[in-house]
């Protein structure tokens, strides 16, 4: 569905959408969450993520930021949390569409048609998160294209990449990306230039 489709959702803040979910974060979300908690991105990634990629959950598989009062980081919650119960899909050509997810079992939230998807995005402060997610996706797409071109020219590299992919599929968390740790990345870059951050 498009942004113009009639849609509304009244969240009851029951917290059911905060359980049994794997929330992947991008650098913008890491920065927002780290600042909300008064941490550097380095400390945030170490304390609150799994391999610097997904938000950590408690042993009961509930988001570590869910408290009895609700989401402890609500003003800076990730895009996927802002969109719920919508999912957003963007094609490689940049075409955007939304899908409505099935409600979590027992969720008392109410669906309706009082507004539009666009209204829902605005009410949840999604626009800066959407822009940053698109920029992150574009960077990933560019890196992927360059990597594919490199592999096409080097059969040994292609075989190695295949082995690495198989290794990553062995039910292990993915390796942490230094790009997600913007504080460390910026600090190392400034140090290399002989500048103080």
Residue ranges and their predicted role:
Residues 1-197:
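Short loop/turn segments that flank or connect secondary-structure elements
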């Amino acid at each position: 569905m498009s942004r113009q489709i009639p849609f509304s959702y009244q969240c009851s803040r029951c917290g059911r959408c905060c359980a049994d979910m794997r929330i992947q974060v991008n650098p913008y979300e890491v920065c927002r969450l780290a600042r909300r908690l008064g941490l550097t991105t380095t400390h945030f990634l170490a304390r609150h993520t799994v391999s610097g990629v997904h938000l950590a959950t408690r042993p009961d598989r509930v988001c570590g930021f869910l408290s009895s009062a609700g989401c402890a980081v609500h003003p800076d919650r990730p895009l996927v949390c802002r969109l719920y119960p919508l999912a957003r899909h963007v094609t490689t050509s940049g075409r955007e569409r939304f899908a409505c997810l099935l409600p979590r079992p027992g969720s008392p939230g109410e669906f309706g048609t009082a507004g539009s998807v666009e209204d829902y995005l605005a009410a949840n402060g999604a626009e800066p998160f959407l822009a940053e997610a698109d920029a992150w996706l574009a960077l990933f797409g560019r890196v992927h294209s360059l990597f594919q071109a490199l592999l096409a020219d080097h059969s040994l590299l292609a075989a190695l990449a295949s082995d690495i992919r198989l290794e990553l599929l062995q039910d292990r968390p993915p390796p942490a990306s230094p790009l997600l740790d913007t504080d460390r990345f910026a600090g190392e870059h400034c140090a290399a230039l002989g500048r103080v951050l």
